[in-house]
């Protein structure tokens, strides 16, 4: 679909689970989206950037969401590797 400026735009872009790469459906009311703020290492203040993680309801239902978020945070460098 095109807008008035002639650019191609999508009507709906589905979210994907950060842990399993599954598409999060519109009726998945158990899914969460979490923003983790990045802070300056010296001052400890918010620097205006954040990482976004989306976890689908199936992962939460299995009880694997905490491990998945920790694994994703380690890979992004938010949590130290030896935690």
Swiss-Prot record:
Single GO MF descriptor: structural constituent of ribosome
Gene3D superfamilies (alphabetical): 3.30.1230.20
Linked residues for Glycyl lysine isopeptide (Lys-Gly) (interchain with G-Cter in SUMO2): 41
InterPro entries: Ribosomal_eS21, Ribosomal_eS21_CS, Ribosomal_eS21_sf
Top-level taxon of origin: Eukaryota
Subunit structure: Component of the 40S small ribosomal subunit.
Protein name (database record): Small ribosomal subunit protein eS21
Name of the gene this protein is made from: RPS21
